[in-house]
């Protein structure tokens, strides 16, 4: 249940969802939440391969313009990759009505949500406030397993985060991920953990309830 008196809709999309279509949907949904016509929502999906540029992205951080489609967005952050094998989570919550008008706390709670979920699969990770994301130590290196990029309109959140489940990590070669030169990425599969999306999603929902519905 939502703290607002009606359920948070939990939607899982089958197949690939076009990135621009997802942007249009989120814009419409935020309008509906603000106007009281629609409920808050958590949307789980996959995108076809795409590079997305947040409001802080710099041209020099796009290393290959022709590798995949490039879409500029209104979310925070820099360049990121979305594609098959990655669980994308878009979170549309009304922080104003929840009396939680604290952006840093919201982002930190997203991080705790991911860290708690990964722990259920035996993965020790941590959320980094400075280099926003969830990181693991692997082969003596810090590697990012989840990337974050949010937007907020009149205290309704949208966009969210992505977790690499079985992502082709070579797809990151065309960008400087999140603008952090020399950074490395990983996935559950890369860490030797095989998890079906359905199982991962179930734990995500359980952990969401413990963090956001208390």
Swiss-Prot record:
GO terms for cellular component: cytoplasm. Substrate binds at residues 75-82, 147-149, 160-162. It is found in: Cytoplasm. Keywords: Acyltransferase, Cytoplasm, Transferase. Signal peptide: none annotated. One of its GO terms (molecular function) is lipoyl(octanoyl) transferase activity. Pathway: Protein modification; protein lipoylation via endogenous pathway; protein N(6)-(lipoyl)lysine from octanoyl-[acyl-carrier-protein]: step 1/2. Its EC number is 2.3.1.181. Residues 36-214 form the BPL/LPL catalytic domain. InterPro entries: aa-tRNA-synth_II/BPL/LPL, BPL_LPL_catalytic, Octanoyltransferase. One of its GO terms (biological process) is protein modification process. The active site is at residue 178. Pfam families: LplA-B_cat. Its main location: cytoplasm. HAMAP family: LipB. Catalyzes the transfer of endogenously produced octanoic acid from octanoyl-acyl-carrier-protein onto the lipoyl domains of lipoate-dependent enzymes. Lipoyl-ACP can also act as a substrate although octanoyl-ACP is likely to be the physiological substrate. In the reaction, the free carboxyl group of octanoic acid is attached via an amide linkage to the epsilon-amino group of a specific lysine residue of lipoyl domains of lipoate-dependent enzymes. Belongs to the LipB family. This is Octanoyltransferase. It comes from Anaplasma marginale (strain Florida).
């Amino acid at each position: 249940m939502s703290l607002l008196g009606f359920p948070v809709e939990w939607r899982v999309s089958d197949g690939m969802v076009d990135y621009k279509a997802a942007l249009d949907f989120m814009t419409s949904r935020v309008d509906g939440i603000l106007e009281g016509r629609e409920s808050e929502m958590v949307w789980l999906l996959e995108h076809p391969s795409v590079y997305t540029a947040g409001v802080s992205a710099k041209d020099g951080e796009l290393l290959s313009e022709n590798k995949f489609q490039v879409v500029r967005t209104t979310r925070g952050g820099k360049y990121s990759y979305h594609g098959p094998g990655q669980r994308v989570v878009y979170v549309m919550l009304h922080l104003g009505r929840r009396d939680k008008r604290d952006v840093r706390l919201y982002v930190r709670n997203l991080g705790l949500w991911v860290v708690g979920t990964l722990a259920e699969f035996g993965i020790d990770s941590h959320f980094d406030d400075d280099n926003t994301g969830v990181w693991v130590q692997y082969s003596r290196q810090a590697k990012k397993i989840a990337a974050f990029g949010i937007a907020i309109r009149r205290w309704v959140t949208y966009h969210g985060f992505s977790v690499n489940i079985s992502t082709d990590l070579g797809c990151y070669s065309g960008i400087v991920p999140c603008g952090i030169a020399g950074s490395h990425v990983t996935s559950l599969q890369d860490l030797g953990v095989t998890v079906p999306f359905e199982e991962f999603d179930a734990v995500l929902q359980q952990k969401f309830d413990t963090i956001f519905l208390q």
